[in-house]
Amino acid sequence: MRPSYLGKILLHWCDTCHVPVLSDVCGCGAATRKVGITPPGDARPAFPADCELVNRIFEDHFGAPLIPPGTIALLNKAPDTDRMEEIIMGGCVVGAIRYITGEKRWEPLPRPEAALFLRPARRYVVVDEGAVPSIRDQGASVLAPGLRVIDPSVRKGDEVFILSPDGSCVGVGRAKMDAGEASAMERGAVVRTRKNAPSRCVPGQSTWEDAVRANSSVIEETEAEAVRFVQEVAGNTERPANISYSGGKDSLATLLVVKKALGNVPLLFIDTGLEFPETLENVAVAAETYGLEVIRASGEDAFWDAFERLGPPAMDYRWCCSACKLHPVRRLIEERWGECLSFIGQRRYESFRRKESNRVFRNGIVKNQISAAPIHNWTALHVWLYLFREQAPWNPLYAQGLDRIGCFMCPSSDVAVIGEIQEKYPDLWQEWSARLGVWQEAHGLPPEWVTEAQWRIRGGVCDETYRYC
């Protein structure tokens, strides 16, 4: 799938501090270097649950975890049929993990730089010294005459590390046959080497507190621009202001910016009845922490009424946002203020649609609301560094491996994420699955429409750039 270019990729790395930096100069004064990641380049911190997932995948496959304790790692979502995450450590992409929906499993995709952080205990091959230059420098395949050792666990299609006789990594690739067959071969290709451009990688230990210090000037400048924007927009209208709060990281960052710009303004929360329990708790915690009123609109009844008529929402049939969010908030605004100014946590790096959106706009359905996006040009890393600096109460779901917070059964969720939600929230998912089952039987749909989450796409194809409401 083609990458989406939604803005300049800002990720750099400081080899002195061993941290990501969002400018060409680190807070320590050292020059930084660009990190080559796949667009849109909205990299985010790898939280403990993320690190556990990556390490489990690599340990299951190669017999060794990838992310060492005390090492900062980031994840960058890359375009794929379901979910693929690039893993960034030491200032470069050291590999990726990809979810294979048909097999319901994760696959590791290492790059040679991964060998700076792990030594494979299985699924590796060792080649003759004479074969090293062509494999390392030209990306040549591993041929049978140059094969010295192949780990017995290697099966056709496996990702493998290619090692020199001294144990250093000279490449990575995919096995073209089982180990037994390869050992008996006298000629032919054993491993198809994957060509990856060499990247500078400097391992080192650091913390996110170090990263906040390294980015202090960037965060201050970014915050100051957002505060000025809020003050300017609010100064140009007499409409009462509020903060559209969802319980996610972006709306929390927006809350902080608006509070610094305008003081206390109320939170506007749309309770669809489909939120995670942690999200509802976060709304309460944020309101209490910052002394803000919460004004609520409810869309739960509207969702189930529409479900009975339309079936489940899908990525290419997003009736849910208008039914459960836009129409309820329009009615609430009309009753409470008539018209209002809402500051929202919308960012251009989230989707093509949001990139094309103006920073100040009106929604076609909620015409009595002016929306303004103070953090429109922030990346996810800007947001997280800001929240870390402010010690803000962010939603604990992020620490559990979710990268975006919304309705628990959002059709924009990847199948990989849906599997995690089913496991962690069986009661929520059991009710949803039962509703899907009734619709499936009533319309003569196959069982896999439910079991393989085919309900998420009505037409069978969906443009990934439009996955966000």
Predicted ranges, named:
Residues 1-244, 252-266, 272-275, 282, ...:
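RNA-binding accessory domains that recognize and position tRNA/RNA substrates
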Residues 2-13, 18, 31, 149-150, ...:
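Nucleotide-activated chemistry modules centered on ATP-dependent adenylation/adenylyltransferase
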